[in-house]
Amino acid sequence: MHNASDIQSALVPMVIEQTAKGERSFDIYSRLLKERIIFLVGQVEEHMANLIVAQLLFLESESPDKDIFLYINSPGGSVTAGMAIYDTMQFIKPNVSTVCIGQAASMGAFLLAGGEKGKRFCLPNSRVMIHQPLGGFQGQASDIAIHAQEILGIKNKLNQMLADHTGQPLEVIERDTDRDNFMSATQAVEYGLVDAVMTKRG
């Protein structure tokens, strides 16, 4: 019985390269990493975040002055996992250019907006969605109150950071993230989440 990740990894294409020492084969993501391209695809969770952070740190060690390109196609996910990626993006020396392919929702949209100003893009038919953080907790009333306070604190922090990245007033962000707020690529530019719609490679 194969699990989903085994099947997925079996479907990842391999690229053959000729080198002075003969042929070398790479999976497609490793080959793109050589071009300083990182893919953030699927749910944002701890394991994925660790891999993205490791790739960012590796590319910084390789060339601290060259841009890194982070392609995002994600429905969102864990706030703490997303913040690990976000903080690393801000921490490292290279500029991180973000590109939305497909969708960037929730934490995916936050990471999209967190790219280097002037280097954040959407492809023409991609979708972006912002909303407030989700939380579900069961237990004693006092514990529920503690978690509710934590979620409120996270919501306020994320809203302030989105305001900083988009240039929108905080009260506008608070209003617009109160419910799921979907945007086209053009609307995401107008809102300040990205800087341009990219139709062709420049």
Swiss-Prot record:
Pfam families, sorted: CLP_protease (PF00574)
Gene Ontology CC terms:
cytoplasm; endopeptidase Clp complex
Task: Say yes or no: keyword Protease present.
Answer: yes
Residues of the active site are 106 (nucleophile), 131
Q: Check the record and name the CDD domains matching this protein.
A: S14_ClpP_2 (cd07017)
SUPFAM superfamilies the UniProt entry points to: ClpP/crotonase
Cysteine pairs forming cystine bridges in this chain are: none
Question: Which EC main class describes this enzyme?
Answer: hydrolase
Major location (coarse):
cytoplasm
The record's keywords, sorted A to Z, are:
Cytoplasm, Hydrolase, Protease, Serine protease
**Has UniProt tagged this entry with the keyword Transmembrane?**
no
Any idea of its EC number?
3.4.21.92
Coiled-coil annotated spans: none
Where does the record place it? Cytoplasm
Q: Which family does it belong to?
A: Belongs to the peptidase S14 family.
Please give the subunit comment from the record. Answer: Fourteen ClpP subunits assemble into 2 heptameric rings which stack back to back to give a disk-like structure with a central cavity, resembling the structure of eukaryotic proteasomes.
The record's function comment reads: Cleaves peptides in various proteins in a process that requires ATP hydrolysis. Has a chymotrypsin-like activity. Plays a major role in the degradation of misfolded proteins.
Protein name as it appears in the record? ATP-dependent Clp protease proteolytic subunit
State the organism of origin: Shewanella oneidensis (strain ATCC 700550 / JCM 31522 / CIP 106686 / LMG 19005 / NCIMB 14063 / MR-1)
What's the name of its gene? clpP
